[in-house]
Amino acid sequence: QGAVVVQKLNTNVFPEPQQLVANARKIEQHLKVKRAAGEYNLEIIEHIPSRSNHYSINIQDDTWRALAFIGDSRSEEVVQSAEQAKTAASAFGQFAAALQDFDANSLYPVIANFHNLAMRMDMLEHAVSADKVGRVKDVQEQLDFCRQQIHLVEQLAALENSIPLRPCHNDTKINNMLFSTRDNSAKAVIDLDTCMPGLWLFDFGDMVRTFCSPEAEDSTALDKVTVREDIFAALVEGYIEPLKAHITEQEKASFWLGAQVMPFMIGVRFLTDYLDGDNYFGIKHPEHNLERANNQFALYRSVVAQQETLKALIVNA
């Protein structure tokens, strides 16, 4: 056995850690079959069993697991180039393609309603009504803006039952991709903790959210928070190419909705947490979640402002 990563699972976020590990193990086994058949070329996160042959163990109310370390690799926090965006998006596309014949319903929903925008909007309104820490008076502009975007909820509802449920990664950030330190190629898709049944539009939208802005998601330089068109074009090409044999036309068209929904939804979640007293997302200072919300709303506005160009890139892919 080589180097191992020992990890404590966050049971506040994942109240049923054994289900999380079971999901990840199912995906690991499926990908190993695909790799052996030459249908998946990336490295695979491998769970290491304990001496008693368990893949997670409890020690004093904490749940731990061990994963095989993937060497000669590095991660990125901000996308540096269109080439890098295409490489990462292609890896996430290969991951999705390898799982297209995996039963999405065999995955346990470890975080219920994770990408349920209607529920996220309801949670925001509950936070407004409770006004636990007296912050509602300071965010009327943001609240008005959120309420004006209700059409996104309606558009998602209209899609229900018309596009297939897929096994999704649900956290397709650039830092959940490992690059080779030798040639900058894609090495592995990591962090399978949120793998659940979902829609590919959410994975696409999360890449838009985390790849396209040149600024970090808590940057207060809102005039610089914008969608870099070359990065967007690269991720569209990279993600869709491996999926061409599997994706429906309606699914591909839904990616435009995903590009809008994901920055808006995480903005709603940051704003909700700000009004609730910062209980979910870790903060570095009192206004941190509000700054994050403003940042994500600025990114959403940038997506919408560039609709004509960005939508065409998806349609023509």
Cite the ranges covered by each PLM segment:
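Conserved ATP-binding subdomain of kinase catalytic cores across diverse folds
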Residues: 1-4, 8-122, 200, 216-223, ...
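ATP-dependent phospho-/nucleotidyl transfer catalytic cores
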Residues: 7, 14-18, 70-86, 101-169, ...
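A short, acidic/glycine-rich surface segment
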Residues: 52-57, 154-155, 271
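Amphipathic, well-ordered alpha-helical segments in soluble domains
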Residues: 91, 120, 149, 207, ...
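Catalytic activation segment of kinase domains across protein kinase-like and atypical kinase folds
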Residues: 161, 175-216
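Small/polar glycine-rich anion-binding or flexible loop at a beta-alpha turn
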Residues: 252-262
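Long, compositionally biased intrinsically disordered regions
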Residues: 303-307
